[in-house]
Amino acid sequence: MNSIKNGFFLCMIFLLWCHVDSGVSIDPFSHSHSLNTECVMKPPRSSETKGLLQFSRSLEDDSDEEWKIDGNGFIREMAQRIQLHQGNIYSFSAWVKLREGNDKKVGVVFRTENGRLVHGGEVRANQECWTLLKGGIVPDFSGPVDIFFESENRGAKISAHNVLLKQFSKEEWKLKQDQLIEKIRKSKVRFEVTYENKTAVKGVVISLKQTKSSFLLGCGMNFRILQSQGYRKWFASRFKITSFTNEMKWYATEKARGQENYTVADSMLKFAEDNGILVRGHTVLWDNPKMQPSWVKNIKDPNDVMNVTLNRINSVMKRYKGKLTGWDVVNENLHWDYFEKMLGANASTSFYNLAFKIDPDVRLFVNEYNTIENTKEFTATPIKVKKMMEEILAYPGNKNMKGAIGAQGHFGPTQPNLAYIRSALDTLGSLGLPIWLTEVDMPKCPNQAQYVEDILREAYSHPAVKGIIIFGGPEVSGFDKLTLADKDFNNTQTGDVIDKLLKEWQQKSSEIQTNFTADSDNEEEEVSLLHGHYNVNVSHPWIANLSTSFSLEVTKEMDQDQVIRVVISA
């Protein structure tokens, strides 16, 4: 049986012992930076005692059997099958290493009964140490699967330790998400209100109103927003960050050589600024040869291409310097290589360097598609996107560049593989840079609303993700995939989901009524707050002149024992 697939070679896992059960004891939600980045001499021992598919190689010697990927790409071993059930989520993890070679991809693949291959996750493995491979599957069927390792190395020998598979119900997965959200998106704050003599003020009311959230769920916009008052009203009442789908792109601002026109982009930016909406820059350049201005496509002289490209970078970045939260510098530069073919292998990295010099305070993104949304992706996989950013940062002069990862998120109309998404975000997050989902959408399908909610909650519950922008809007906007409202601006089901999440991820205004006890010298009231900026007012229901207000920023860096002390002048 030939097992060559997209240049990878499959090796079936031979299971000496296995068990699949439900529960939440295994933790795919663990985001230890060291585990996700380090190659260790000896993997940590698993704390799991039951409910696992488990297989390990001995760490004491090299005499144990290894999984060998035949030079001809043939499967050589029979596997014990695992029964999966539709509606559940299965997380996978294993410590892997190679007998020979370094920095080679090793992945996990699930093969269904009809031969379909579902890729579940990947990692770069080495021969001298063990690397953690994470992933999983959300089956759209009930039935058996065979589990494989895959490698880009013909004839590779793979060893694995602590191979674990865990089954979660959707309710269990959601519970883990919620627990993590409470941990990573909120901090506990204690208020202590005293007089100048340090005695507690009894019965005060502490009012809290969030003025700015640290995590933003935004939406793309296009030129039609300038033509529709209803669209503008709909947008401004919901979103605090946006990106323009086309209006800042080179082919939109310089349709003829030397004739720049930023009128539309400037007008859209003014609308955003007037309504307190932040803007993400999209995009300085695009590496897709088909997406260059028509006149650029006709230039054959590399020196001339370099001249017009440098002019473009300087023009757009200097024009909007200090006005944007980030820039996609060379869009989709793993899938495409127009500038590399015309100008050399270091074209992208050098353009990031120029962008950094022009605006050193703005986040500069590598922005790619299929990185988290398509398990079959071969070109812009999480480990390849990570490597691209590492190469950019390693370019001379880029050491202190504020890098970031943009995962576009153009999902297909099927159940998203949440376990794979989480493992992909783990890989990207191991860089320690912010991740944004930048263009989330999905074709219309019966379960679109639920699928979109699943995706957004998965991203929100990952600590490396700092914001999300969806590509959708009301019918008048022309977004034909993610339509959030009809022509009369009445919500669709997916629009209801977005409004629900916007409300849920914004801290509700609240009042804390302190206890009216008289036997305590110090009163502290504790509240769990979403990260962001707040206006705080302290008052007393029957002491008219006892009132004070101040601003407070709640951050993840806050000490969990953080006490906000408010001193009232008598």
Curated annotation (Swiss-Prot):
<keyword id="KW-0732">Signal</keyword>
<feature type="domain" description="GH10">
    <location>
        <begin position="202"/>
        <end position="501"/>
    </location>
</feature>
<keyword id="KW-0326">Glycosidase</keyword>
<feature type="signal peptide">
    <location>
        <begin position="1"/>
        <end position="23"/>
    </location>
</feature>
<feature type="glycosylation site" description="N-linked (GlcNAc...) asparagine">
    <location>
        <position position="307"/>
    </location>
</feature>
<comment type="similarity">
    <text>Belongs to the glycosyl hydrolase 10 (cellulase F) family.</text>
</comment>
<feature type="glycosylation site" description="N-linked (GlcNAc...) asparagine">
    <location>
        <position position="261"/>
    </location>
</feature>
<feature type="glycosylation site" description="N-linked (GlcNAc...) asparagine">
    <location>
        <position position="537"/>
    </location>
</feature>
<feature type="glycosylation site" description="N-linked (GlcNAc...) asparagine">
    <location>
        <position position="515"/>
    </location>
</feature>
<feature type="glycosylation site" description="N-linked (GlcNAc...) asparagine">
    <location>
        <position position="545"/>
    </location>
</feature>
<dbReference type="InterPro" id="IPR044846">
    <property type="entry name" value="GH10"/>
</dbReference>
<keyword id="KW-0858">Xylan degradation</keyword>
<dbReference type="Pfam" id="PF00331">
    <property type="entry name" value="Glyco_hydro_10"/>
</dbReference>
<dbReference type="GO" id="GO:0031176">
    <property type="term" value="F:endo-1,4-beta-xylanase activity"/>
</dbReference>
<keyword id="KW-0325">Glycoprotein</keyword>
<dbReference type="InterPro" id="IPR001000">
    <property type="entry name" value="GH10_dom"/>
</dbReference>
<feature type="active site" description="Nucleophile">
    <location>
        <position position="439"/>
    </location>
</feature>
<keyword id="KW-0119">Carbohydrate metabolism</keyword>
<dbReference type="InterPro" id="IPR017853">
    <property type="entry name" value="Glycoside_hydrolase_SF"/>
</dbReference>
<keyword id="KW-0378">Hydrolase</keyword>
<protein>
    <recommendedName>
        <fullName>Endo-1,4-beta-xylanase 5-like</fullName>
        <ecNumber>3.2.1.8</ecNumber>
    </recommendedName>
</protein>
<dbReference type="GO" id="GO:0045493">
    <property type="term" value="P:xylan catabolic process"/>
</dbReference>
<comment type="function">
    <text>Binds to and hydrolyzes insoluble and soluble xylan substrates.</text>
</comment>
<feature type="glycosylation site" description="N-linked (GlcNAc...) asparagine">
    <location>
        <position position="346"/>
    </location>
</feature>
<feature type="glycosylation site" description="N-linked (GlcNAc...) asparagine">
    <location>
        <position position="197"/>
    </location>
</feature>
<comment type="pathway">
    <text>Glycan degradation; xylan degradation.</text>
</comment>
<feature type="glycosylation site" description="N-linked (GlcNAc...) asparagine">
    <location>
        <position position="490"/>
    </location>
</feature>
<feature type="active site" description="Proton donor">
    <location>
        <position position="332"/>
    </location>
</feature>
<keyword id="KW-0624">Polysaccharide degradation</keyword>
